[in-house]
């Protein structure tokens, strides 16, 4: 790390932009929103919409008994409000940007506080850690805890080391074996009659999202030796899946929606059986 390339940190107060520039990449933050809005590597834009904390999933058939409290608290429409934003040079070739947000639905009390720390290295690597603090004691079990971002649609190929090739969740994964898998983003979508949460891959240690030439983003769990994460990559948002009643109603976006979950709630079988076990609830 001591041999990292130098980084330039520039702030345009008039445009409310903080930029971190390396030898072949630029990362931009909106200082009013406290969000990463651009990540350009070798002239290629990797971000279509800023990464944000995400706590909602499109309800499955098994979620019909818990979806009401999810929506009562507005988990499907949470918006971040910036509380604090700062940038610091940790050492030569290493810059850390920290943003504190509170998430709430419109005209509702704040539900969750997040502290996101982006550590940017001179070689182009970015380390993201997010701390979550609930602000309401009465919160229902959450569907997921993670980050969601949109990337350009050209990045439509997925390769991962984790459970596959079929979808897997904390309590539904025995038939999905650990290995290396490749498929298109379109092929990760499970076309249930009623659109809903689908296509997750549990216990993932690393996954790459690339274009036809193999250029893209590699996501790695820092705790890969001990625990993985769950991810989905779709051409639909959770809200689109929730609102559609049948598959033909879905119109694919031109971008790829990526969800990376530290934890994903269990699926259970509560459409006609028991809800998820306590150990699979968040």
Question: Where is each model-derived feature located?
Answer:
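Beta-strand/loop-rich accessory regions of lumenal/periplasmic or secreted enzymes
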Residues: 2-282
